[in-house]
Amino acid sequence: GNTVNVLQDRWTYELVGLLSHGVRVGQYNRLIASLEGHIIGDPAFRFQPVEPNTLATDMTTRKGDAAYWRSLLASPWADVQSLALRMLTDAGAISAGELLEFMKQSPLATTRMECLKLIGRFGDEEIFAQAIIRGLKDRYELLRRNAATYAWQSSRLELLPALADTYVNDSESKRVAYIVMK
């Protein structure tokens, strides 16, 4: 009981747009397994794709094909770009620095959030700190909240000025301020 919406600041709809591209529900669940995520029914179920593609099979058959996933970085769809970034990261075919540059130039909020999350997997503290500082100023509130969480988890002193600035100057976002004060 009480397992729905108990966890706060979770990115519960990460990559959910892949379902509109014909990705099967079971494939999506493997990418985004969470305590609050439940599959009831057939995990092989899929929706009709918004445009013809082979994304559902490519996730398996082209898993290590870095050139293919790099080509999808130009997709107009945020979740397709995010999946491509995830596949490149999993294959070791993209660096934390490249992800930071992609985060800086992307107009898509969920893609920027995916970049921040993936940069955290590299262990490059300098680049991660740069991504956190950028994330604290992002217009997407979920990204700001996650950046604030990553900042206090990292305990890096150079993040203190950015956290203080966020607390003082981002008065519209009470949830970000709450995380900063942890």
Name these PLM-found stretches:
Residues G17, R70-A74, S82-R86, L100-K104, ...:
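Amphipathic alpha-helical repeat scaffolds
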